[in-house]
Each structure stands twice: as C-alpha cells, then as structure tokens.
C-alpha cells in the first residue's frame, strides 16, 4: 500500500513539474507571420506634363515640393518584411511553407497597403560672406503603410495598425535618396516595435541580487538564451493582482538585461523603481516582467 502511495506521489510530482515546464515554455511561444498581399496606393499614378510644370512652379514660388517616389516601392516592401522578421516572438515565413501549413493558433498573415512614399523638399535662400545669393535645399522622407494582421487559421482581422517612417524625430538631408531611405528604415523599426508590444517576452523575478539599503540594484529573471533574451533588452516590472476575478497589472519599475547567464536566467540592472521592487520582493508579491523594447 505504501508503495502505491509513493508511486502516486511520484506521478503527481512529475505531472506538476511537467506542467510548470510547459507553462514556462508556452508563455514565450513563437509564432509564424507571413506577408500576404502588398499594394502601393500610388503604383499606377502618372503625372501629366501640366501637373509636372505645376509642381515646378509651386516649388519656385514657395520653396517647397512634395513628390511621390514610386521607384522605392520594392524597398518599402523589403522594409516591411524586415520589420515583421525582427520581432521577438514571430518567425517570418519566407514562402517555403504554404499558408495551409501555418494555420496553428496564433500565427498571423499580414497584408499591407503602402500609402505614401514621399520626398519633401524645402529650399531657402541666403547671402554668403561675399553677398552672393545661395540656395540650400533640404529633403525629408516620409514613408507610410497600413498593415492588416489576420489570424492565419480563421482569417479574422486581429489588428489594423498604421505605420509611419517620419514624424517629429525625422531628419533632414541634402539628398532626397538618403532622406527616403532613412524613412524606410524608420518604418521597419516601427513595425518591429509594434509587434514586440503586441506580443512581448515575459519573465519572472526569481531572486534579488545586489541591493543598497532599501533599494534593489540588480535582480535575476527566468529568461535566457532559449527564449530570446539578449544584453540590453529593457523590461518593465509589474505587480500582478486579481481584482473581481480579473488580472490587473501595475508597473512599478524598469530593468535592463546586463548579462544572459544561461538558457533560462539573466542578470538585470534595475533602472527605476528600485525601492518598490525591493519592497515587493521582501513582501513576497507576485512580480511579472514584460519586455518593452
């Protein structure tokens, strides 16, 4: 009888361990993402001679011009692919797999409409030291796209974000090509950032490391090489509570991975919230760590 109870206890223990391991692996499960249709809204547009003259005259009068840069259509498509490929938890399907082979739960198909590929020029005149009139022209690139993300299994639209490769942080250049290529790179980065927020990496604080007085300086988290951790990754720290049967998260700090020390462990520097993080660890609070890059 004792042997029976010991055997049952061992089975239960193994089942609990396996379940915990499955949950650990499933929290950062990776998904496939496939690029479906890509359209350029201005693909078939052709400017008449009169329109071209009008653009030139407008530029002369105002010092500003705006022209669709249609020749960069393929570059923008490649930037969209790069953006989809660079996300933490998505693996880009490069066409080797048919759509029928990627219909597992969570996999996505992305259709894109490129709405704008534009170079804006701004000219100003000024006098040099010899009192000669000089003209300086600067260019700003703007690239915009709308991406429709659909569930690969059901075809249901799950998100419809719009991305822009310009904005307040965009740079001006003396060359239109450089301006547009900078905007294209920014577009790619925006797509990756959005996907990383939509489906972030998750971890738990497993131990407090260095501390000073009442502030936590370093912690260890259960995220390592096997789940895509890397040095420099920023992560938010959240207290998790259950309120009226619902999970509620409240951010109390921020971490930065200083060293990936194994398949499932990394050492992190506490960048903010050290006092609250230490208090939560000491109180045995449940802390969730979520990537914010």
PLM region spans:
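Positively charged n-region of N-terminal signal peptides that target proteins for export
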Residues: 1-4, 20-21
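Sec-dependent N-terminal signal peptides
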Residues: 4-14
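A structural "domain/chain start" motif
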Residues: 19-87, 164, 199-205, 209-218, ...
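C-terminal/domain-edge helix-coil "capping" segments
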Residues: 21-28, 152-231, 236, 242, ...
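A short, hydrophobic beta-strand-centered structural micro-motif
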Residues: 28-39, 90-148
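Flexible, solvent-exposed loop segments that connect beta-strands
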Residues: 54-66, 124-135, 244-245
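Short, Lys/Arg- and Gly-enriched loop/turn segments at beta-strand edges
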Residues: 242-252
């Amino acid at each position: 009888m004792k042997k029976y109870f010991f055997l049952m206890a061992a089975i239960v223990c193994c089942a609990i361990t396996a379940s915990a391991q499955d949950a650990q692996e499933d929290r950062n499960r990776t998904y496939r993402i496939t690029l479906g249709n890509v359209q350029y809204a201005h693909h078939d547009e052709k400017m008449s001679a009169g329109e071209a003259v009008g653009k030139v005259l407008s530029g002369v009068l105002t010092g500003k011009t705006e022209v669709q840069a249609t020749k960069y259509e393929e570059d923008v498509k490649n930037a969209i692919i790069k953006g989809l490929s660079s996300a933490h938890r998505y693996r880009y399907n490069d066409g080797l797999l048919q759509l029928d082979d990627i219909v597992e739960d969570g996999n996505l198909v992305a259709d894109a409409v490129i709405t704008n590929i534009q170079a804006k020029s701004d000219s100003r005149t000024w006098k040099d030291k010899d009192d000669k009139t000089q003209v300086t022209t600067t260019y700003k690139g703007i690239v915009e796209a709308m991406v429709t993300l659909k569930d690969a299994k059901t075809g249901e639209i799950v998100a419809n974000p719009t991305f822009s490769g310009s904005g307040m942080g965009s740079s001006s250049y003396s060359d239109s090509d450089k301006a547009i290529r900078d905007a294209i790179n920014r577009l790619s980065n925006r797509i990756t950032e959005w996907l990383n927020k939509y489906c972030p990496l998750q971890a738990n604080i497993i131990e407090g490391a260095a501390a000073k007085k009442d502030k936590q300086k370093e912690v260890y988290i259960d995220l390592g090489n096997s789940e895509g951790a890397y040095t420099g990754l920023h992560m938010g720290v959240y207290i998790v509570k259950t309120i009226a049967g619902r999970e509620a998260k409240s951010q109390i700090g921020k971490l930065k991975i200083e060293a990936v020390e194994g398949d499932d462990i990394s050492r992190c520097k506490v960048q903010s919230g050290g006092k609250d993080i230490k208090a939560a660890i000491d109180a045995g609070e449940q802390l969730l760590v979520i990537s914010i890059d």
